[in-house]
From Swiss-Prot:
Disruption phenotype: GPR15-deficient mice are prone to develop more severe large intestine inflammation, which can be rescued by the transfer of GPR15-sufficient regulatory T-cells. In addition, dendritic epidermal T-cells from mutant mice remain low at birth but reach near normal levels in adult skin. GO terms for biological process: angiogenesis; G protein-coupled receptor signaling pathway; T cell migration. It is a multi-pass membrane protein. Belongs to the G-protein coupled receptor 1 family. Phosphorylation is necessary for YWHAE binding and efficient surface expression. O-glycosylated. Sialylated O-glycans in the N-terminal tail inhibits binding of GPR15LG. The gene is Gpr15. This is G-protein coupled receptor 15. GO terms for cellular component: cytoplasm; endosome; plasma membrane. It comes from the Eukaryota.
Amino acid sequence: MEPATALLIVDYYDYTSPDPPFLETPSHLSYTSVFLPIFYTVVFLTGVVGNFILMIALHFKRGNRRLIDIFIINLAASDFIFLVTVPLWMDKEASLGLWRTGSFLCKGSSYVISVNMHCSVFLLTCMSMDRYLAIMHPALAKRLRRRSSAYAVCAVVWIISCVLGLPTLLSRELTHIEGKPYCAEKKPTSLKLMWGLVALITTFFVPLLSIVTCYCCITRRLCAHYQQSGKHNKKLKKSIKIVIIAVAAFTVSWVPFNTFKLLAIVSGFQPEGLFHSEALQLAMNVTGPLAFASSCVNPLIYYVFDSYIRRAIVRCLCPCLKTHNFGSSTETSDSHLTKALSNFIHAEDFIRRRKRSVSL
């Protein structure tokens, strides 16, 4: 069965490539040619500056660096590379969908975006699993959490992401319609739609499920520790807040667009389509910018809610300031939680063994 020919697409960034006739409505023209270029400009400037400062601050930070900072630096690099391509798409939206920068950048920018989107999702998953080990299994984490392991995992993530982005080089092309150039996707086939469906599930929904599962377990353990200790531990409360905000930001950024993307792919398998193609395309055009915005949000989240990163950024921007101005403690929230929860877990094990011995 030949898939339906529609406006719908199967890559993260393809919401920027609807057919030209669909754009020729006044309301949609004002959205794509006025709002989106302004929005992308803000995302580009704040994201490039924020991620660059974050990378520099953590890379050149004095003293010992946290293990999770390796993932954060790679995530910032992934977002930074992604944001470098945003001006190309800004120009596209401002020119009413025309692609004026040639075939090489059409394929190349699409490939870069695809690679870094996969990389970002996988790195977020690795970060959640790293926090899960550090907080839920402190003893096991001491054996597994090594800098060499973190570097190796990041290298594997980049390699896999580069491989997963290769189909983009084959599917994207510079198409001329009525003499006007458009960076668009080739006509979808059943095989391509099937690949898009499998890729979407394995590179987004499965990682999202693992992220939510890890953070739910972490939050449950933190709440149990908080109730057991009976003290108002500000670091524990702040850690729970960071977890909730990180999950919420990731979910709000990606779930809406990828949900409509999933519906678009499923609809493409049907001759007439299960859903109205223009309605789905409009929904993806509206929710798509949220995915772009996610690349500039992470530095802000880390700066506001992670005092360790905040101190590193301030010291990077103002090296003349002394350490004691930001507190003399060098203990990170992860190390604090690991020690506290390790004692909590050992206490739980002791109570269980004691109950077992009494019952015997």
